[in-house]
C-alpha cells in the first residue's frame, strides 16, 4: 500500500472522535462538501481520508488534526433532511503533509502519507504488552469499558500497535490525549503511556463505583424508611395512636383561646395561622418541626401574667440597706423612683381606666467596675419581688440577638428580650441590660438602634420581634442598664435613660463592706466558721491599700477568698482525720465527746489569725494602689488628679528647662486634648510673666566674640526650652483636666519656685486663665485622700455643684479649695 503514497485523497472531517484502521464505523454527513467528496470516491473507487475535528482552535490553524485514518466507503444511504449515512472501513493511519485545499468540484483534498512505526525490541515490547493486558483486565473488573469479546480480541492479537489502538478506542479518551497516542510512531512509548492512562482510569472507575454504591444504598434505605413509615401510619391509624398529634393541636388551640383576652388581634391571628398550618402539614415534613417549635415558643410567652404584689417603699429601703453598704445617693434615687411607681399604683386602683398608662422605669447605673451596679439591680428585683432577667450586652454586634431571627433561617429563635420574658414567666420582670456601653456596630446591624425602641416608653408598648412577627408590650418591664462609661453610649440612647452614678468607695467604706459582707460570704463559701479565721483591722486596711487597685471591691473579694482557701488547707493539714469522713463517723465522734476528739488529734480551738506580719504568707503580690506623696517640696514636680476606669489616681507631672529657644516638648503618651492643654498652659504662663504677675529675673544672652558688647536681654521663656513629662509613658493619657497642674509646673520651673508637695489639683484651663469644671471629681478626691494629700484645688463650679457627693470622710480629712483662675492656683501652689 505504501508504494503508491504519498497521494492526494478526498478529506472528510469527523466531529466526535478518532477512527482507527481496524474499525468499520457508520458516519453521518450533512455538509455538502463532504457529501460531494464521498460521491467522488465512490464513482472513482478512490480511498478517502478522515481526520478528527479540533475542539479548540488557535489563530491561523486548521480546524482538524493532521493525522487520521485512510479507508474506503463500503456503503452509502440517503437519510431524511438531506443527510447521508455511509459505512466506513478503516485501513491504515495517515498524516496530512500539506494543508488541504478545496478543488474545482467543491470538496477538500489533501496530500496523505501513511504513518510508519519505528522498529522495536520484540521481547521488551511483549513484556510491556503483558503488563498492559493485566491492567486492562483489572479495569474491566470495575467498569463496562471492556466487554468479554474485546478482552478475547486483545488476548488473540499479537500486534502490539493493534492492541494499543483497540485499547485507546475503548477508553473514549479526550481528543488531545487520543491525538498524542494516535500520532506517536514509537510503539514502546505508546504502550507505556497507555499503562499510565489505564491505571488512572481504574482509580476513577473504582471511585465512581463506590459513590454509585453509596447512593444506591442510601436510596434503598430511603425507600425502606418511607415504606416502613407508611406501614407505621396505617398501624397507628388502626390502633388509634395517631391521636396524639390531634391532642397536641387541640391543646394549642385551647391555650390560644385562654390567652386571647391578653393578645392583640395581630398576635392572635399570627399564632392561629401557624397552628392551622401545622395541622395541615405532614408530621414527617421539615416544616412540621419548625412550625411546632414556633407555636410552642409563642404560647410560652406569659401573655397576661404579671407580678401583682404591691410595691412597698419600706421593704425596698430595707432590702437595699441589707445588700449594700454606703451608696447613699444611688439608694435615695432608687427609692424615689419606686415611690413614684407606688403612688401611681395607688391612684390607678381608684381609676382603673388609667392603669395602662403606667410606663416601665428605665434606670442606668454607671461607674467603675466592681462598685455594685449589677448587684443593685438584683436587690431591686428582690425588693419589689419580681423575677430578674439579666441580658449581657458586652460585645453584642448582631441586631438579631435582640430583635430575633426571621423564621426563614434554619435554627431561628426569638430575641433575648422575648426569651427573657419566657424565662421570667411574667410580663413585668426586672430586666438588667448589663454593659450597655459595650454594644458594637457591625455589618449585621446596630444593636444600639434596636435598644432605642426597647427603652423608649412611648415605643416599647409595641416592640416587634422578627421571630414572633407581631408586636409585644414591654411597657410594664422595669429596664435597668449598667455601664462603665456613659460617653460611649449613643446620645439618642442616653436620652431615654435616667442615670444614677455609682462611684468609687473610700478605704473606710471598703473596710466596712469587707467586714459586714465579703468576709462572712467567703467564710460560708469555704465552709469555715467565723471563729476559725481572724483578719485584724490593720491587716484588712493593709490589704485594701497595698494589695488592691480598684474603685470597687471585686479584687478585694478575690484577695479575701485567697486567704480563705489557704486557711481551709491549713485546717485539713492540722486535722488529717477529717478527710473523707462520713456523717456516721461524725455522729460517733459527737457521742464520744471531747476525749475521742483529742484521741483523733483534732484541735478544738483551731483559728488562723491574719496580721500584717504574716500577711505575705497568704498574699504574695503587692499592688500599691496609690503611691504616697513626697514630703519634700520640689521645683518642677506637681500633683495632678486623674480619673481612670478603675477609679481616681494621683498623676505626677514633671518639667525641666534646658538652654534653648523657648520650645515646648511633651512626652508621656499624651492625647491630642492633653497636648492642647499644655500649649494653652504655656501661653498663659508667658502672659503672666509678661505682665509680671509672675516675677523672674531676665536672662542675658551670650556675649559677642570680643566679650565686650552684650546683645539684647532675653525673657526666661525665650531663653530655655521646656520639657514637660507625665510619668508611666506606656499608659495613654488624655483630657483637659490637667490644665492648671501643667501651668503650675511650668511656672515653678521657669520661676525657680518650689511647689507645695501636699497640694494636688484638677481643672481645665482657658487661654484667659479661667478654671473650668471637670468630671470624675469624687474619684479624684478619694485618690487624693488615699495618697495623703492635705489640700485639693478644684474648680469653683465643681465646688458649688458636686461637693455634696463627696464622702464625709474625705471632706473632713481633705482641705478642698475652690479656685476661679490661674492666679489663685499659683498663689496656693508656689512657695
Curated annotation (Swiss-Prot):
Gene Ontology process terms (BP): cellular response to heat; protein quality control for misfolded or incompletely synthesized proteins
Residue segments, region Disordered: 574-605
GO MF annotation list: ATP binding; ATP hydrolysis activity; ATP-dependent peptidase activity; sequence-specific DNA binding; serine-type endopeptidase activity
Positions that bind ATP: 367-374
Uppermost EC category: hydrolase
Keyword Protease: yes
EC number assigned by the record: 3.4.21.53
Subunit description: Homohexamer. Organized in a ring with a central cavity.
Protein name, as recorded: Lon protease
Reactions listed under catalytic activity: Hydrolysis of proteins in presence of ATP
Database matches in CDD domains: RecA-like_Lon
Transmembrane region(s): none
Induction field: By heat shock.
Residue span, Lon N-terminal domain: 9-202
Protein species of origin: Helicobacter pylori (strain J99 / ATCC 700824)
Coiled coil ranges: none
Residues of the Lon proteolytic domain: 632-831
Gene Ontology cellular component annotations, sorted alphabetically: cytoplasm
Pfam families referenced in this protein's UniProt entry, alphabetically: AAA, Lon_C, Lon_lid, LON_substr_bdg
Active-site residues (renumbered): 737, 780
Family classification: Belongs to the peptidase S16 family.
Gene3D superfamilies for the chain: 1.10.8.60, 1.20.5.5270, 1.20.58.1480, 3.30.230.10, LON domain-like (2.30.130.40), P-loop containing nucleotide triphosphate hydrolases (3.40.50.300)
InterPro entries: AAA+_ATPase (IPR003593), ATPase_AAA_core (IPR003959), Lon_bac (IPR027543), Lon_bac/euk-typ (IPR004815), Lon_lid (IPR054594), Lon_proteolytic (IPR008269), Lon_Prtase (IPR027065), Lon_prtase_N (IPR003111)
Amino acid at each position: 500500500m505504501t508504494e503508491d503514497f504519498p497521494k492526494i485523497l478526498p478529506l472528510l472531517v469527523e466531529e466526535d472522535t478518532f477512527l482507527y484502521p481496524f474499525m468499520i464505523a457508520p458516519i453521518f454527513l450533512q455538509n455538502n462538501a463532504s457529501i460531494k467528496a464521498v460521491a467522488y470516491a465512490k464513482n472513482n473507487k478512490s480511498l478517502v481520508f478522515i481526520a478528527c475535528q479540533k475542539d479548540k482552535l488557535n489563530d491561523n490553524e486548521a480546524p482538524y488534526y493532521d493525522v487520521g485514518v485512510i479507508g474506503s466507503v463500503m456503503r452509502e444511504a440517503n437519510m431524511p433532511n438531506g443527510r447521508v449515512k455511509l459505512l466506513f472501513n478503516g485501513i491504515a493511519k495517515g498524516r496530512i503533509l500539506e494543508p488541504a485545499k478545496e478543488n474545482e468540484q467543491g470538496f477538500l483534498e489533501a496530500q496523505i502519507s501513511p504513518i510508519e512505526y519505528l522498529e522495536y525490541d520484540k521481547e521488551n515490547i511483549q513484556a510491556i504488552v503483558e503488563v498492559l493486558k493485566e491492567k486492562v483486565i483489572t479495569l474491566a473488573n470495575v467498569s463496562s469499558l471492556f466487554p468479554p469479546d474485546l478482552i478475547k480480541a486483545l488476548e488473540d492479537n499479537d500486534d502490539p500497535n493493534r492492541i494499543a489502538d483497540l485499547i485507546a478506542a475503548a477508553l473514549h479518551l479526550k481528543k488531545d490525549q487520543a491525538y498524542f497516542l494516535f500520532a506517536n510512531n514509537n510503539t514502546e512509548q505508546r504502550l507505556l503511556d497507555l499503562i499510565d492512562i489505564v491505571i488512572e482510569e481504574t482509580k476513577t472507575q473504582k471511585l465512581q463505583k463506590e459513590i454509585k454504591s453509596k447512593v444506591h444504598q442510601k436510596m434503598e434505605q430511603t425507600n425502606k424508611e418511607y415504606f416502613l413509615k407508611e406501614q407505621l401510619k396505617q398501624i397507628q391509624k388502626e390502633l388509634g395512636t395517631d391521636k396524639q398529634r390531634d391532642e397536641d393541636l387541640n391543646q394549642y388551640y385551647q391555650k390560644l383561646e385562654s390567652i386571647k383576652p391578653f393578645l392583640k388581634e395581630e398576635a392572635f391571628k399570627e399564632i392561629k395561622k401557624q397552628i392551622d398550618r401545622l395541622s395541615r402539614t405532614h408530621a414527617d415534613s421539615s416544616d412540621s418541626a419548625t412550625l411546632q417549635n414556633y407555636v410552642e415558643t409563642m404560647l410560652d410567652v406569659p401573655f397576661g401574667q404579671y407580678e401583682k404584689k404591691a410595691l412597698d417603699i419600706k421593704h425596698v429601703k430595707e432590702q437595699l440597706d441589707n445588700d449594700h453598704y454606703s451608696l447613699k445617693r444611688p439608694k435615695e434615687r432608687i427609692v424615689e423612683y419606686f415611690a413614684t411607681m407606688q403612688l401611681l399604683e395607688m391612684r390607678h386602683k381608684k381609676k382603673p381606666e388609667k392603669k395602662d398608662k403606667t410606663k416601665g422605669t428605665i434606670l442606668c447605673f454607671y461607674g467603675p467596675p466592681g462598685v455594685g451596679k449589677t448587684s443593685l439591680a438584683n436587690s431591686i428585683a428582690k425588693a419589689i419581688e419580681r423575677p430578674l432577667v439579666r441580658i449581657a450586652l458586652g460585645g453584642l454586634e448582631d441586631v438579631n440577638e435582640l430583635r430575633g431571627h426571621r423564621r426563614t433561617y434554619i435554627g431561628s429563635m426569638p430575641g433575648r428580650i422575648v426569651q427573657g420574658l419566657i424565662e421570667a414567666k411574667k410580663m413585668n420582670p426586672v430586666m438588667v441590660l448589663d454593659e450597655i456601653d459595650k454594644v458594637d456596630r457591625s455589618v449585621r446591624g446596630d444593636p444600639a438602634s434596636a435598644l432605642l425602641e426597647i427603652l423608649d416608653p412611648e415605643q416599647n408598648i409595641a416592640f416587634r420581634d422578627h421571630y414572633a412577627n407581631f408586636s409585644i408590650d414591654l411597657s410594664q418591664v422595669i429596664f435597668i442598664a449598667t455601664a462603665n462609661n456613659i460617653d460611649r453610649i449613643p446620645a439618642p440612647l442616653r436620652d431615654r435613660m435616667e442615670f444614677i452614678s455609682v462611684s468609687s468607695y473610700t478605704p473606710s467604706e471598703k473596710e466596712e463592706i469587707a467586714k459586714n459582707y465579703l468576709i462572712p460570704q467567703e467564710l460560708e463559701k469555704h465552709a469555715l466558721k467565723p471563729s476559725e479565721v481572724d483578719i485584724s483591722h490593720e491587716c484588712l486596711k493593709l490589704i485594701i491599700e497595698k494589695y488592691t487597685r480598684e474603685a470597687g471591691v471585686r479584687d478585694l473579694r478575690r484577695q479575701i477568698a485567697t486567704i480563705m482557701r489557704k486557711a481551709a488547707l491549713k485546717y485539713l493539714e492540722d486535722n488529717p482525720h477529717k478527710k473523707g469522713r462520713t456523717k456516721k463517723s461524725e455522729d460517733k465522734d459527737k457521742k464520744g465527746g471531747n476525749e475521742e476528739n483529742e484521741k483523733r488529734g483534732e484541735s478544738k480551738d483551731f483559728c488562723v489569725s491574719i496580721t500584717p506580719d504574716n500577711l505575705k504568707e497568704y498574699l504574695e503580690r503587692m499592688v500599691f494602689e496609690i503611691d504616697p506623696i513626697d514630703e519634700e517640696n520640689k521645683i518642677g514636680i506637681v500633683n495632678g488628679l486623674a480619673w481612670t476606669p478603675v477609679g481616681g489616681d494621683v498623676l505626677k507631672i514633671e518639667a525641666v528647662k534646658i538652654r534653648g529657644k523657648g520650645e515646648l516638648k511633651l512626652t508621656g503618651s499624651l492625647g491630642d486634648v492633653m497636648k492642647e492643654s499644655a500649649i494653652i498652659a504655656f501661653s498663659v504662663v508667658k502672659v503672666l510673666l509678661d505682665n509680671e504677675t509672675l516675677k523672674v529675673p531676665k536672662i542675658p544672652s551670650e556675649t559677642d566674640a570680643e566679650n565686650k558688647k552684650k546683645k539684647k536681654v532675653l525673657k526666661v521663656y525665650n531663653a530655655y526650652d521646656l520639657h514637660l513629662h507625665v510619668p508611666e509613658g506606656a499608659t495613654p493619657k488624655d483630657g483637659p483636666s490637667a490644665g492648671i497642674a501643667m501651668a503650675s509646673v511650668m511656672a515653678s520651673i521657669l520661676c525657680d519656685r518650689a511647689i507645695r508637695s501636699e497640694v494636688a489639683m484638677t481643672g481645665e484651663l482657658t487661654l484667659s486663665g479661667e478654671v473650668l469644671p471637670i468630671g470624675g471629681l469624687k474619684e479624684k478626691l478619694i485618690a487624693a485622700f488615699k495618697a495623703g494629700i492635705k489640700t485639693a484645688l478644684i474648680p469653683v463650679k465643681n465646688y458649688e455643684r458636686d461637693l455634696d457627693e463627696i464622702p464625709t470622710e474625705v471632706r473632713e480629712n481633705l482641705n478642698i479649695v475652690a479656685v476661679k483662675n490661674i492666679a489663685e492656683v499659683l498663689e496656693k501652689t508656689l512657695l
